[in-house]
């Protein structure tokens, strides 16, 4: 779950895309990898507070202690917001802890503890076009009638052991476990005898282990070659219940089942320099995924929905990189992947009945070619990609917050990605652009028997998006910056009869620093940001194929946030 990533203590965020991301496993068309920073040797502490428009309140604090042999980082934050829209308040508390131990020069042990508590996240629901245009801050009537909201609690612990066996071989062992509790009140009662209920209650436990062996050596040519083999095994058990929503109060039982999902993956990767300027990468991942449902709510109106599905697939990938110059690399990658439906995607079938065991895994073929240039003061990335999938898992309908999915063949995504960054003295400009041509290659029948024509665009995808930003730091104390985000129109349904218009949204930010980074000193940071500078009205997200026509989730208007942070070094 992306919400549990704790960005205040992150050292870096990496976005891995393209065919080589398939090596990360099932559904890895892309990977967002958040790495928590290591504890600072010698110790440090910091605390901050921020206030913003619409009742935004944020406090956070972190503490580092220990040395190079044993270090600990603890980070705690709390956020609240009254909400820009009616019925959109939320609050959450997040703890992130990291321990790094180096018992000897060849061994590193890393432990991560993440605790996430979100007791309240009100849902104002989507708006239809008339509501969106007349008053984007409103909540629809059923949101207050049924008190639509969600609470989430997730705790997880992971341990990684890295050990250098000898000069060529290294071993990594991983283990993790966690729990997740979710209660969600939807915008209908779910009182019918064959309904799954209008209140979702999940209690989930999950754990897994993994190992990887890496050998780094040199070929007879003297060029490096590295190979890795590994094994992952994961298991998730879930108790899913559904209750009648009695105007925001949980009522009679309507669903009761135990769900299980397991996967076992074997993978290997080879990385070799075949000449001083040519590098080849190849690998595969063989996966077995099984999903089981054990139904315990069986009545004459609600028959036994127990069942199971198993999927097996091998995802091969290959890539080639040419170092044309010391600053320019050209590359090409190709691969195949697959995506099994999640328990959430299988949870409902048409007619508001039980699990959708007819949902199949999606299979894709993708390739990309690109170039990466890194000069003395600027860098440029260019990539052209093409992905074609069979059995694409798409939402056929979403009614009252509940989504039903189906498979669609010959879904195509192709496009161009550009990213540029430069350092020009005190100025740091950045720009990125994406052209995405995503469409259904075959006709199919959607919700309510609607005919979806070949060539219709995938809903929720903009053909053009761009980001422009510039930072200016005239001194080591001052910094100011501006951003501009642009996006084209986006269709909201498979029939392409409803759409959200494109938008251009600007923002400003500034910061001032007091003190220096000398050990034993205190450094103060003052910052401010102004989002949606010109108070543009636009849809931040869409509820694709909403059965009630409430597709649009408005983004917040102009908003200001200011904060102060103290660092004790």
Which residues make up each language-model segment?
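N-terminal periplasmic accessory domains that precede
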Residues: 1-9, 15, 27-48, 59-63
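Short loop/turn motifs that connect adjacent beta-strands in outer-membrane beta-barrel proteins
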Residues: 39-44, 68-69, 105-106, 164-170, ...
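Face-selective signature of the C-terminal outer-membrane beta-barrel domain
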Residues: 106-114, 151-298, 321-323, 381, ...
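Gram-negative outer-membrane beta-barrel transporters
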Residues: 213-214, 280, 288, 379, ...
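C-terminal beta-signal and adjacent terminal beta-strands/loops
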Residues: 477, 486-491, 512-569
């Amino acid at each position: 779950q992306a919400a549990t990533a704790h960005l205040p203590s992150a050292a870096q965020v990496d976005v891995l895309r393209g065919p080589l991301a398939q090596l990360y496993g099932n559904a890895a068309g892309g990977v967002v990898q958040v790495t928590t920073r290591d504890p600072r040797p010698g110790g440090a502490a910091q605390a901050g507070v921020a206030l913003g428009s619409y009742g935004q309140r944020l406090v956070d604090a972190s503490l580092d202690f220990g040395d190079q042999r044993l270090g600990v980082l603890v980070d705690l934050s709390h956020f609240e917001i009254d909400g820009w829209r009616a019925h959109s308040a939320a609050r959450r508390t997040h703890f992130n802890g990291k321990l790094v131990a180096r018992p000897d020069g060849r061994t590193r042990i890393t432990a991560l503890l993440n605790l996430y508590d979100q007791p309240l996240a009100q849902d104002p629901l989507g708006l239809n076009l008339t509501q969106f245009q007349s008053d984007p801050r409103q909540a629809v009537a059923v949101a207050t009638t049924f008190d639509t909201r969600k609470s989430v609690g997730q705790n997880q612990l992971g341990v990684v052991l890295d050990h250098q066996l000898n000069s060529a071989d290294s071993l990594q062992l991983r283990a993790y476990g966690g729990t997740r509790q979710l209660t969600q009140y939807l915008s209908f009662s779910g009182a019918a005898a064959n309904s799954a209920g209008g209140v979702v209650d999940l209690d989930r436990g999950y754990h897994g282990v993994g190992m990887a062996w890496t050998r780094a050596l040199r070929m007879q040519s003297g060029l490096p070659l590295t190979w890795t083999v590994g094994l992952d095994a994961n298991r998730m058990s879930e108790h899913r219940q559904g209750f009648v929503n009695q105007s925001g109060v949980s009522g009679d039982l309507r669903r009761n089942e135990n769900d299980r999902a397991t996967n076992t993956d074997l993978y290997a990767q080879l990385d070799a320099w075949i000449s001083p300027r040519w590098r080849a990468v190849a690998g595969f991942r063989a996966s077995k995924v099984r999903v089981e449902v054990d139904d315990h709510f069986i009545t004459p109106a609600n028959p036994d929905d127990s069942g199971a599905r198993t999927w097996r697939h091998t995802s091969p990938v290959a890539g080639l990189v040419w170092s044309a110059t010391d600053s320019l690399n050209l590359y090409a990658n190709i691969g195949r992947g697959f995506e099994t439906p999640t328990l959430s995607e299988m949870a409902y079938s048409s007619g508001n009945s039980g699990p959708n065991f007819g949902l199949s895994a999606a299979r894709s073929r993708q390739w990309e070619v690109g170039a990466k240039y890194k000069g003395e003061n600027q860098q440029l990335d260019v990539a052209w990609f093409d992905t074609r999938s069979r059995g694409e898992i798409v939402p056929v309908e979403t009614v009252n917050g509940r989504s039903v999915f189906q498979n669609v063949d010959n879904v195509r995504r192709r496009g161009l990605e550009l990213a540029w960054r430069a350092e020009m003295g005190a100025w740091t400009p950045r720009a990125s652009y994406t052209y995405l041509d995503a469409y259904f290659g075959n006709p199919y029948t959607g919700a309510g028997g609607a005919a979806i024509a070949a060539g219709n665009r995938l809903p929720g995808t903009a053909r053009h998006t761009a980001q422009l930003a510039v930072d200016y730091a005239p001194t080591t104390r001052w910094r100011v910056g501006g951003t501009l985000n642009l996006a084209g129109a986006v269709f909201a349904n498979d029939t392409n009869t409803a759409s959200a218009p494109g938008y251009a949204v600007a923002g400003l930010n500034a910061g001032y620093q007091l003190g220096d980074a000398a050990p034993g000193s205190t450094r103060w940071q003052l910052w401010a940001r102004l989002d949606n500078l010109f108070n543009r009205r636009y849809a931040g997200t869409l509820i694709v194929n909403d059965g009630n026509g409430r597709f649009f989730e408005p983004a917040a208007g102009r908003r200001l946030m200011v904060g102060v942070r103290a660092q004790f070094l």
